[in-house]
Amino acid sequence: MQGYCLDFWRSGNWLGLVPAALLVLITAASAGRAVIVEDWTANRVGQRGIPSGWTGEGFGRRADYDFTIEQAGEVRMLHLQSQNEHSTIVKDITGKVVLKETPILEWSWKASVLPKGGDVRRKETTDIAAQLYIVWPRFPALLRSRIIGYVWDATTPVSTVVRSQKTGTVTFIVLRSGSKDLGKWLTERRNVVEDYRDLFGEFPENPTAITISIDSNDTQSAAESFIGPIIFREK
């Protein structure tokens, strides 16, 4: 079996599986009203560092931004790698997403390496390979902003909802956990309005930013993930 898997990998046949998984998302979005907030096509394949249209958020920590734009078939993606550091990028979506019209957030992602011992329930181990955040800034930002983070954690069980132990403005929703689906492209679909209501008890305003992160500094380990198109669409 090991030899077969190695031959399959070397053959390049696995490349055909990636666009199929990602194109499902693009096709679904085109079927109804949709807002594609990122599909990575504004960046050239092989481009490294912070992608066009995004800004880096260092939070006073080491941030390598070891990001690369890659392409499989017709679909582009962001490849994220982290080695004992924390990298976060933010994109302004002010005025682009109206949740009353497009409340469903869809995206595709893959985790390849999970930070060793990462656990969002503990401040000292809050390292995550794949993270996508929706941001509602409120003044003062550090105290009152509301941020929902959809994450692939190393150890925390799926469906766990937990407030960040580092900042009270972030609430994690664990969608994937552990190595069960490691190396697989998965498509996620979340009703942001329902998630917000469940957490805060009211209908949300329209979000003004999305954030992507990868970190491995707390556990002094490594992490790797990929993220494809990010889309808001109608129900």
Q: Language model features by range: what are they?
A:
Residues 127-132, 168-178, 182-221:
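Extracellular beta-strand ligand-recognition surfaces/modules
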Residues 32-58:
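Extracellular carbohydrate-recognition regions
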Residues 40, 210, 229-232:
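Extracellular beta-strand elements of beta-rich domains used
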Residues 65-87:
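Short carbohydrate-recognition loop motifs
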Residues 16-27:
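Bacterial N-terminal signal peptides
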Residues 79-101, 116-117, 169-175:
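Secreted extracellular polysaccharide-interacting domains
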Residues 112-181, 223-226, 231-233:
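Extracellular ligand-binding interfaces
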Residues 100-112:
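A carbohydrate-recognition surface predominantly in extracellular/luminal proteins
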